[in-house]
């Protein structure tokens, strides 16, 4: 398993769709998504998600979008594009962002017959249609992917090998959900997850030389190899010597590159990642503490418990009772 896939797996990435929106120029709204905005029945889809990433898939027309407070960082998006808001910041969308914004939550209309929430708002000008959805993450504040993404992330689904499939499937499933057809929400949930993974991969591929951060580490061959090894075999009793030998670098060269790109030494990264996997196991499985300790590479339950309490301020059993 590659490192990106492993990080997203542990984060319990989930997706869904909650709104069909239709706007007519001139218009401007301010919005941030919360669980209360998601369509009925999507609570189970969210699962243990503690963080939501809204996205907007544009079907027709174009508009501007920016994160509130980020003046001068407007994006113009049009048909076939998806814009994601990785930190779920309050963001402005509209035909003209200089207009006084209306709160998105004030213009949402409730779903009918098990379909989507809907919005119809604006003047008498050009129409813009979009589908709004979300990605749910568990423990996003500790997730190395989320922390390195920009405030706004744009994906053009017209580009890439799967463009036609993504576009046609998304539009078909959205139409099915809008009329309350059973099973279509599941299709859109999985497609939402695919869109996010594709957006992250394309963003990582387009990073400029000299960029730092976890995603930039995936572009440096030796660091990417080290990350893949650590994620693939988390239970191994890794040492810096072992890892440097596997990736074909000296200890010092690997440590320098890893720290420059990832921000901390390889063994510190591994220790942090083991704790993230531990929280996932504690929250979503019935595995014993001894079993979890073995899975993530600790020699004993006691050693695992000490490390966990140091990281989170509570013993694993206590944490499980509070977060299960």
Stretch-by-stretch model annotation:
Residues 96-128, 140-154:
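Double-stranded beta-helix
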Residues 131-228:
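An amphipathic alpha-helical interaction segment
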